[in-house]
């Protein structure tokens, strides 16, 4: 009781102080002041997220658990408060013109987070528990636990996802969702498909985690709003939004395999006006990695990387029913793999080198009216990439290249709440998009001058009915692609059954397509047998079509002081006119070629399991596992040896079993421990001649990759925290044992964990 009286007394003093300091022209009303505390202990909860459902406005509580909103129009609002380790709470508040509204939130401890707010389900902010499709979320807590510096090292810890390195020289990464390779999935930045085929080559390693607030993943087609080419799923990168006045500095030093070093530094700052009408978040990241040679042949398995990223995200509110958002980031990267790094690329035996200058930005204007039941969003984004490259072997002076890539997208989205649509209340969403990608790739030595202009005009609409126990979402997307004669119609249907807060069941059907165009791996040249291997498109290449089905059961329960959640998901995808790569030998200019052709079809099906169990902050365990089959409908030719066609029905580089786990614990208030790991099952990988005599298909062993990290936080002056951390990645030193060696190696014959045993130490300063 004394604590409650003390809290009330402090708030009264705070209100009086606020009223005394209000400048002329601002009334004492139109303000919400609040306090967030723990339910049982009544301790302050700092850095809780507070979100106004009607306006989309948000902030975070300060070190004392306090927050405020100013200049709110009088009326009713719903405030949703969430914090790591606590249940989400929503309350209705009434804002008056005459006085300040004071509200208190008491959050109950919740060990398994189920109420995170997500936008990837239907482009509207909803609780993950109420989303019509399964949305997996990777947060900053996960990035810290696995000590990931970039997006590529984070995605392995999301069920159904697996990141692989496809080049022994330059380190070309791609993410597979439910076994489907990278081009089947769509990478979004703040819900915009601005990541082009060229930026997809190395893009997963060019996005530092300190620019990311969270990553939302939808497996399968799911929503009609994000593109029919998202056959495998979507990876939506939500960048940091300014919500409070804060800053952070990080530094990390790592040693790969005992003789190769990597240094990285990052900085973040966020500034928000007291009345929350404007704010800006800034981030910067620098990373330098030396090349690593695992087998001592003088050729790198991990290339040299030097990358610098700077960016910002800002907002301005002309009124409390409108918001203007701006974002921009630039990346400068030098990447090189091969040998003789002290010489020019054409003086080495093998070099794959790229220099990227990337500039990307966007603007969004959001407007709400009629009590925010209707919202309109206008948006435009643009990205330009200037790439200078060298993909060559045997001291080839003509293997230099230059690529210019421009991508832009513009559109509008309308969302309206309907009190009664046919049989229940609903939320209707529709919109239009137009996107264009202009690519010009020149490689004089390979006599390649590729120009590609892709234009897609799209319309989408979907309606979501909420019927208490059921939620039904039906949507349609229409895409007119300039490389396809007829418009593509892609319907989507999602059904959510929610008999209780603890149980949700979902069914999903979606369709999609992939256009006959160049994708990320087509813009990369693999060195095999001392020469570069290119990819060309077949003259009669048709679009690839897909039909996808999925179903899931999501159950949360408590037993004693423990809380658990288990998600079981089944999926099935049928692909027609599936794209395959076939070795076609030398072209007229004597260059080795592969051709992208249409196969008969393929089926990918299987099951995901995602389980979590936690006991407060004491200990938390999360396990994800996937069992699947990826098979062509008939055997497809992948190469010929002495006139004999070699075929396979099994999709290459796709294991039938893979998974991950994360185990975190805080035995002391300031001490955090984490043990994490991934499992990769056996798969088939093509091995082309050069180092070996003839092409052959290899069956790989399985791998277990374990990581350990410890972090301790010191409280410095004026709420400044200093964290010191250290650990080891790939404790077991699981790494490919049959690497090709020398200048005639097949650089594409590379699989397994992407780095050897690595020791690291780091510091972080935050306020």
Task: Map each language-model feature to its residues.
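C-terminal beta-signal and adjacent terminal beta-strands/loops
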Residues: 4, 576-577, 670, 679-688, ...
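Short, acidic, small-residue-rich periplasmic hinge/interaction motif at the N-terminus
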Residues: 22-24, 35-40, 48-53, 82-86, ...
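Short acidic/polar hinge/loop motifs at secondary-structure boundaries
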Residues: 70, 174-176, 192-219, 240, ...
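Extracytoplasmic beta-strand/coil segments of soluble accessory domains associated
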Residues: 152-193, 213
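Outer-membrane beta-barrel translocator/receptor signature
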Residues: 196-198, 211-213, 224-236, 240-296, ...
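Membrane-embedded beta-barrel scaffold of Gram-negative outer-membrane proteins
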Residues: 267, 375-391, 506, 540-597, ...
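Flexible loop and strand-edge segments within Gram-negative outer membrane beta-barrel domains
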Residues: 289-309, 315-376, 382-405, 449
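Gram-negative outer-membrane beta-barrel transporters
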Residues: 466-471, 571-574, 595-688, 764
């Amino acid at each position: 009781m004394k604590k409650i009286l003390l809290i009330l007394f402090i708030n009264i003093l705070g209100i009086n102080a606020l009223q005394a300091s209000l400048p002329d022209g601002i009334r004492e009303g139109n303000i919400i002041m609040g306090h967030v505390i723990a339910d049982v202990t009544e301790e302050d909860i700092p850095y809780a997220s507070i979100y106004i459902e009607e306006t989309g406005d948000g902030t975070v509580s300060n070190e004392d658990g306090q927050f405020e909103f100013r200049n709110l129009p009088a009326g009713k609002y719903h405030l949703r408060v969430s914090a790591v380790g606590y249940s989400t709470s929503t309350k209705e508040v009434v804002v008056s013109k005459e006085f300040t509204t004071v509200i208190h939130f008491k959050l109950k401890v919740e060990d398994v987070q189920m109420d995170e707010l997500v936008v990837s389900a239907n482009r509207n902010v909803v609780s993950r528990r109420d989303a019509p499709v399964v949305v997996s979320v990777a947060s900053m807590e996960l990035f810290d636990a696995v000590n990931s510096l970039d997006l590529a090292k984070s995605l392995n810890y999301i069920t159904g996802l697996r990141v692989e390195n496809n080049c022994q020289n330059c380190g070309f990464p791609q993410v597979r969702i439910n076994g489907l390779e990278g081009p089947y999935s769509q990478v979004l930045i703040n819900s915009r498909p601005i990541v082009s085929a060229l930026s997809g080559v190395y893009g997963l390693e060019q996005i530092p985690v300190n620019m990311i607030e969270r990553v939302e993943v939808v497996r399968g087609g799911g929503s009609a709003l994000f593109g029919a080419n998202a056959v495998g799923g979507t990876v939506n990168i939500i960048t940091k939004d300014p919500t409070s006045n804060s800053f952070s500095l990080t530094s990390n030093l790592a040693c790969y395999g005992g003789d190769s070093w990597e240094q990285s530094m990052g900085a973040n700052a966020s500034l928000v006006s007291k009345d929350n009408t404007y704010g800006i978040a800034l981030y910067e990241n620098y990373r330098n990695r030396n090349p690593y040679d695992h087998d001592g042949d003088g050729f790198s398995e991990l290339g040299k990387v030097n990358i610098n990223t700077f960016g910002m995200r800002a907002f301005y509110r002309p009124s409390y029913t409108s918001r203007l958002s701006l974002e921009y980031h630039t990346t400068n990267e030098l990447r090189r793999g091969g040998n003789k790094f002290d010489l020019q690329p054409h003086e080495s035996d093998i070099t794959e080198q790229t220099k990227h200058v990337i500039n990307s930005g966007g603007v969004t204007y959001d407007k709400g009216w009629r009590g925010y039941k209707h919202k309109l969003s206008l948006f435009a984004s643009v990205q330009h990439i200037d790439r200078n490259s060298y993909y060559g072997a045997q001291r080839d002076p003509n293997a230099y290249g230059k690529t210019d890539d421009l991508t832009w997208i513009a559109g509008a989205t309308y969302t309206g709440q309907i009190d009664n649509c046919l049989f229940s209340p609903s939320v209707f969403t529709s919109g239009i998009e137009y996107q264009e990608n202009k690519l010009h790739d020149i490689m004089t030595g390979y006599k390649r001058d590729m120009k590609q202009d892709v234009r897609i005009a799209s319309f989408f609409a979907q309606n979501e009915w909420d019927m208490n126990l059921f939620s039904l979402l039906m949507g349609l997307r229409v895409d007119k692609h300039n490389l396809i004669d007829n418009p593509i119609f892609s319907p989507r249907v999602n059904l959510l059954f929610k008999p209780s807060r603890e149980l949700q069941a979902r069914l999903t059907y979606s369709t999609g397509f992939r256009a006959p165009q160049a994708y990320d791996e087509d813009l990369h040249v693999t060195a095999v047998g001392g020469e570069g291997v290119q990819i060309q498109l077949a003259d009669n290449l048709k679009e690839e079509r897909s039909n996808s089905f999925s179903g899931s059961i999501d159950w949360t329960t408590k037993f004693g002081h423990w809380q658990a959640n288990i998600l079981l998901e089944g999926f099935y995808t049928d692909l027609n006119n599936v794209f395959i790569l076939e070795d076609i030998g030398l072209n007229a200019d004597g260059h080795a070629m592969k051709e992208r052709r249409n196969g008969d079809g393929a089926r990918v099906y299987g099951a995901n399991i995602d389980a979590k169990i936690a006991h407060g902050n004491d200990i938390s365990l999360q396990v994800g596992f996937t069992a699947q089959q990826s098979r062509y409908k008939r055997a497809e030719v992948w190469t010929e040896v002495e006139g004999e066609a070699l075929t396979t029905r099994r999709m290459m580089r796709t294991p039938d079993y893979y998974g991950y786990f994360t185990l975190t614990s805080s035995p002391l208030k300031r001490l955090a421990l984490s043990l994490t790991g991934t499992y990769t099952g056996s798969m088939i990988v093509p091995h082309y001649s050069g180092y070996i005599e003839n092409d052959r298909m290899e069956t790989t062993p399985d791998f277990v990759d374990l990581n350990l990290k410890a972090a301790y936080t010191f409280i410095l002056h004026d709420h400044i925290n200093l964290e010191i951390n250290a650990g080891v990645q790939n404790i077991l030193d699981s790494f490919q044992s049959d690497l090709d060696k020398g200048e005639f190696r097949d650089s594409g014959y590379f699989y397994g964990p992407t780095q050897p045993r690595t020791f690291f130490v780091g510091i972080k300063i935050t306020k």
